[in-house]
Amino acid sequence: MASRDLAESLLPVGGGAATATATATAHDEYDERAYDSDDKVSIAVSDSDSEDGGGGGGDAMRPAFSWRKLWRFTGPGFLMCIAFLDPGNLEGDLQAGAAAGYQLLWLLLWATVMGALVQLLSARLGVATGKHLAELCREEYPPWATRALWAMTELALVGADIQEVIGSAIAIKILSAGTVPLWGGVVITAFDCFIFLFLENYGVRKLEAFFGVLIAVMAVSFAIMFGETKPSGKELLIGLVVPKLSSRTIKQAVGIVGCIIMPHNVFLHSALVQSRKIDTNKKSRVQEAVFYYNIESILALIVSFFINICVTTVFAKGFYGSEQADGIGLENAGQYLQQKYGTAFFPILYIWAIGLLASGQSSTITGTYAGQFVMGGFLNLRLKKWLRAMITRSFAIIPTMIVALFFDTEDPTMDILNEALNVLQSIQIPFALIPLITLVSKEQVMGSFVVGPITKVISWIVTVFLMLINGYLILSFYATEVRGALVRSSLCVVLAVYLAFIVYLIMRNTSLYSRLRSAMTKST
């Protein structure tokens, strides 16, 4: 019964309430838009799609299911799922497999389910309001809070991009047999924004097709590895359904959960769903869009889950319980695979590198895409596409080049840096999830598409759980890597400000906050 209520609450609430788009104000002529009207994809597959069926009333019925219509909506979910397949996730997968074998597959499954819930809410927000999360944050919060949220999101983007670009650079180094150094791979990867701009000029569907090819490359590469290494099917199934967690695999468990929810991906998905031409004055059309986006997002995440399973089980079969298990990472995983399995159909080292390159390239380009929406939405900047892409690319590529020049992939310091980058992204998660849940729970924002009470409660439980998991990661890093009384004291002050901001975001829409604010206003 609870699962049925949850499913129903992810669809619009019935009744005569006006649609969210009827209550939302139209975009100002000078406001930043996710997509111009000329760039949007038509979803009409028949003459009935342009008729006035359904209207905007509360009794409007969603049009009948159509496979052709689903195909028209397919795309945004697959761009979104790339964040579940970035080099950081692949590293978490291989380390979990090497350190814990098949034992953490159940956690990977449920982490993906939690990620799916977050992304479905993000898509719902974008469709129902006609605006993406960054824009709505600018309207919801005062200027100082908006700037703070923007800064936090940009930091998360930079942290993710460094890992993604380094992942691509490692793959290029492997494929070039070491001819191209790490910094050279970074330079090559830096030009991916030009590929992005080139494809974007040819339309959204061409861009989506390009990402579809990259996902297919990953799926084929890692499926070939799965076939060559032949992991145990029985242990795989047991790992999926039987929860196991030991003290020695806590770090890998935290890594799996922490990598799934990427802050910038929440902002990205709410913008991507606006790439279709939807008559937002008709409730039935908005309801239809939410329905199809839910389906295609779930299908995309099933694909990403399959790829993550392949990577985890390959390294579980090859390295669980071995001497290499503790020291394996992106930079040496290919060599270890080659030593273990040699050459069968094609050198497994290069199969790994091809999959890693597809992962790195796709995630860096989607990072650039997300950066455009984040900057434009929070700051209300209307810039030319090429200029926004160059600015957002520069934010990340400069620190990445510094990392590539001063660190070697086999240097132990690189592991510390990766851990620091994971922490950097972890601390940003509340600043994406709290505004998201706050907004989808407000009838003034969502209209009749406001989420139901069961979905709201589950969403807050997931958010608190993720915050606790990532809090553990932060405290672990603080205890093991932070040295010096002055540095620790400074970080304690920063932590206090950080927690205060989180409390503010949570309490801002409560009656207690309203009473406190009213009392403070009267006292002044």
Curated annotation (Swiss-Prot):
Belongs to the NRAMP (TC 2.A.55) family. PANTHER family: NATURAL RESISTANCE-ASSOCIATED MACROPHAGE PROTEIN 2 (PTHR11706:SF33), SOLUTE CARRIER PROTEIN FAMILY 11 MEMBER (PTHR11706). GO terms for biological process: iron ion transmembrane transport; manganese ion transport. Residues 34-58 are annotated as: Disordered. The keyword Iron applies. Keywords: Ion transport, Iron, Iron transport, Membrane, Transmembrane, Transmembrane helix, Transport. The chain crosses the membrane at residues 70-90, 98-118, 155-175, 179-199, 207-227, 253-273, 295-315, 341-361, 389-409, 420-440, 457-477, 486-506. The gene is NRAMP2. It is found in: Membrane. Probable metal transporter. It is a multi-pass membrane protein. It comes from the Eukaryota. GO terms for molecular function: cadmium ion transmembrane transporter activity; manganese ion transmembrane transporter activity. GO terms for cellular component: membrane. This is Metal transporter Nramp2.
